[in-house]
Structure formats: C-alpha cells, structure tokens
Amino acid sequence: MKNLFIVIVIFIISRPNVLAQEDLFDILEEESPQTKNFVTSTFKGTRILNGHSIENRNKGTLEFVISHRFGRVNLGAEELYGLDQSNIRFAFEYGLTDNLMLGIGRSSFDKEYDGFFKLKLLKQGAEKGSFPFAISLFGSAVYRSIDDFEPGNEPSSSERMSYTTQLLIARKFSPGFSLQVTPSLIHRNSVKIEDDPHNIFAVGIGSRVKLTKRVSINGEYHYTVNPLESIDATNSLAFGIDIETGGHVFQIILSNSITMIEKSFITESTDDFFEGDVHLGFNISRAFQFGKNKKKKLKEVKESNQ
C-alpha cells in the first residue's frame, strides 16, 4: 500500500486563569470543584476500532468483548466475499479502579493469548484553563501458541512473546468531535530474519464524529516508522460506525487488517485498503456492573450519551 500521510490537528490549549492572593482556605474552596470536573465520553467505548481508545471501564465493571474480522471482500463469490474466512477474539476486561483497567483475550489468528493494562495518567478538564488532554498508558503482552515451525526448530516460550507499550493522548474538542494520537513501541523477543527489527515504532491517529446520542463514525490509522523486512507490510487503516444501546456497544468496521492485537495489526498487516483488500468486521461488548448503586449507574449512562 502506498504511503498514506495524514496531517493532524493542532490541539487548542486554553490559557489558565491566574488566582489572586487569598486566604489558603478560600483558594482550596475555589479549586476544589474544578478538580472534580472532567470531560467524559471522549470515545463511545474502550476501542476506537482496532486499537484502544482513552476510555476505561469504571471500577467494578466487567466487560465481555467479541471481535470478529472476515476475509478480504475482493476474494469474490467463491469465498462469499470473505465471509468464509474469519479471525475471532474473545476478551474479558475489568475496571480494577476508576483509573486502572485489566484485560485478557484469546485470538484464533496464530492462536494468540494476550493480557493488557490501561492506566489513566491525566484527565482532560472541563473548566477553562484546565488540562487540555487526557493521557493514558497502555501495555500488553502476547503469547503466540501456534505450532507452525519445522521439527527441531520450535521456539522457546520466551521467543514466542511480544510486547506493546503505548501512550494514548486524546482531546474532546466538542460534544461531536474527539481526536486521539497514539505513539507505540512494539517489541518482539524473536524475529523471522536478521533484518527484521526487534523494536518497531509507530504513530496512530483516531477520531470520532458524533452523529446522534448513540451513533458515531470513527476512523483510525497507524503509521509504522520501521516496518518488518520479512513481509510486504502496510499501514493499518480502518473506518467504522459505533452504535451504543444501553450496556452494549456495537462497532461495524472496514479495515485492511484481519488481526485485532496491537503487535499484529500495527506491524503485520499486508493488505492494501485501496486495492480492495478490505476486511469486514465487528466488535460487540456487554458490560456488567458489580458493587455499584443505581444512582451511580444512572449517572454513568447519562455520561455515555454525551
């Protein structure tokens, strides 16, 4: 796929207010409400499309996620336009605290098992002069369990491991538009050929445009700085629709990536979106609340519609 250059947005930073000299208790009284007012629902769910969004599940929330990607649409009628082929991933994700989410999953592609954490570092303030971005740290580990190696050349458990570290930087510019930039580092303990880099750097960008309270359109693109040399790698591109219905978030996706784990769709995609190598897919999630009262749950539902 030919290189795709996306020029991204300059974030708008509001000038902070200057507090006058006052009594210490008066200052604390004025600042206290500001520290509690943060922007919510930058994205509808925990995924933009393929990649993670800035959003976490709140404390005590367990989410079951099913992700599915079919084969290429341009395979034609013989393969039912890709529907005869598929890759599926099941995952459980849990809000350990309001700021820390943990997850585990299993993909049919390469029989990969993955675990991840996502930690909120900074939140975007809702008041004028407050911090203009939301920032989270994401980390994952993947174990490739498929046995597709020649006898006597099987990799060790350590050689089957890959790791991803990402900084998720997002801003909700308005109720209808959000943007996220995602610098990424993917590390492989082993590579196919000597020229393949163990460490791959990439930069992703994702956006959300809200159409109604429950429907939005999303886009996502990841540019790889130093791609693998052993394959004809392409940059991951995806477009999709978010539909939210109560405890469900349903995403319909068109992407040139058949995989759904960061180390795979960022660095191992080989299809060209503009040549018709498009994979139809979907993500569907169901959230379950534990240990939360009805009042707090109602508040979260209202925030999700913002």
Predicted regions, residues:
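Sec-dependent N-terminal signal peptides
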Residues: L4-S14
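Sec/Tat signal peptide C-region and signal peptidase I cleavage site
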Residues: R15-A20
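Transmembrane beta-barrel domains of Gram-negative outer membranes and organellar outer membranes
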Residues: Q21-N153, M161-T165, A170-V181, L185-N189, ...
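Surface-exposed extracellular loop regions of Gram-negative outer-membrane beta-barrel proteins
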Residues: S86-I88, V203, R208-N218
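Nucleotide-sugar donor-binding catalytic core of glycosyltransferases
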Residues: S158
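Extended, charged alpha-helical interaction scaffolds
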Residues: S190-V191, D195
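Charged helix-capping and loop-helix junction motifs
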Residues: P197-V203, A233-L237
